[in-house]
């Protein structure tokens, strides 16, 4: 996978996006049409513009940075001037919710592209609806999480994290924090999503033989269930010593329960993503390591590729995907950060050098400064 240059590409002008992270979940960028309420279908444009839609898997603060990336791409590429809009649509009803939204897209004549973070990598109905859209001439891509290999011929590209590597980075962090090993449970929303499977498998692989997995608990993106899963895991496993959050909201769910039980000293806590509350929780000493993705880059690059394809811009496509025709060449890696507390952490940059330049080690204060510079509250 190729590391995206976008962390540098969006340095200029991102300061104007302070409000972008607060957009409604399907706010259309580059158009005067009215946006629908969060979690509903985007309103078809009445201006004759073609729409580029990014459909997420569930609503979360994680997507705010992706919306900022979409907005910046719309501005840089002058979408409105050239007859296009770009927006994110939020799915709030699991696999069935995505299937229904894809069916509705098929009835709308103004859609140029659909880029999806599929709730299930292996759901044939999702793949079938994407295929139906593709047959109508709509460009299909994935971001954040990919389809299973057997369905990948349906989509042209994937933009996002190398999720196996992300899991390995988190596993390496756990190993560095607790070198003698221990028992762990991994917490996630949907166990069938490719990013979930790859992250959990990657964690297990990198953590090594001294660590023993005691479970993989799913919550269907219900925050109450997420906390219940943590409580049950702690109550049922007296030797448990590592709690692993795989999706963004799992971090605060873990911290809530550990605080509730007054058991911080018993657990190493390692998590994915950096919701604003999780950043504050690390500041309070409640999280030991975070693997942070680049959702801004996911949003920006997805729009950039689609617009280049629509315009016949072969040079940009070749720059973004130089090996597009090769196996795996239609995947664009947007990179990772591993974030550690400022004080008292045994983690060092050298522990993560094996993962190459696409993985950047930052102390929490450095990460906060990076967010502040670009007017982001999380990533």
Predicted feature locations:
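Bacterial N-terminal signal peptides
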Residues: 9-18
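Bacterial N-terminal signal peptides that target proteins for export
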Residues: 1-9
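A residue-level marker of the well-folded mature domains of exported/periplasmic proteins
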Residues: 22-379
């Amino acid at each position: 996978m190729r590391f995206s240059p976008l962390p540098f590409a969006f340095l200029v002008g991102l300061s104007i996006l302070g409000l972008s992270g607060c957009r409604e979940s399907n706010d259309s960028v580059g158009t005067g049409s009215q946006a629908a309420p969060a979690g509903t279908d985007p309103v078809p444009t009445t201006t004759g513009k073609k729409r580029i839609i990014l459909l997420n898997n569930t609503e979360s603060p994680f997507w705010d940075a992706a919306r900022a990336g979409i907005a910046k791409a719309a501005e840089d590429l002058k979408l409105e001037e050239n007859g296009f809009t770009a927006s994110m649509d939020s799915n709030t009803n699991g696999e069935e919710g995505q299937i229904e939204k894809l069916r509705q897209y098929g009835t709308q004549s103004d859609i140029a592209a659909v880029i999806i973070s599929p709730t299930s990598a292996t759901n044939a109905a999702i793949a079938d609806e994407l295929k139906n859209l593709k047959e109508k001439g709509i460009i299909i891509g994935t971001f954040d999480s990919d389809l299973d290999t057997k369905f990948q011929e349906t989509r042209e590209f994937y933009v996002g994290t190398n999720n196996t590597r992300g899991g390995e980075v988190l596993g390496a962090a756990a190993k560095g924090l607790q070198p003698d090993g221990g028992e762990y449970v991994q917490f996630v929303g949907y166990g069938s999503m490719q990013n979930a499977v790859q992250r959990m498998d990657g964690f297990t692989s990198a953590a090594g033989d001294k660590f023993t997995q005691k479970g993989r608990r799913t919550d269907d993106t219900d925050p109450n269930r997420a906390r219940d899963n943590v409580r049950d895991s702690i109550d049922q496993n007296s030797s448990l010593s590592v709690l692993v959050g795989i999706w963004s909201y799992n971090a605060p769910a873990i911290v809530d329960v550990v605080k509730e039980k007054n058991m911080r000293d018993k657990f190493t806590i390692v998590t994915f993503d950096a919701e604003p509350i999780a950043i504050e929780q690390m500041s309070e000493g409640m999280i030991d390591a975070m693997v942070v993705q680049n959702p801004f880059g996911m949003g920006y690059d997805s729009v950039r590729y689609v617009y280049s394809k629509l315009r016949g811009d072969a040079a940009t496509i070749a720059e973004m995907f130089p090996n597009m025709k090769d196996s795996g060449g239609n995947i664009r890696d947007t990179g990772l950060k591993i974030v550690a507390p400022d004080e008292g952490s045994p983690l060092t940059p050298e522990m993560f050098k094996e993962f190459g330049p696409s993985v950047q080690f930052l102390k929490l204060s450095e990460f906060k400064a990076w967010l502040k510079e670009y007017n982001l509250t999380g990533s």
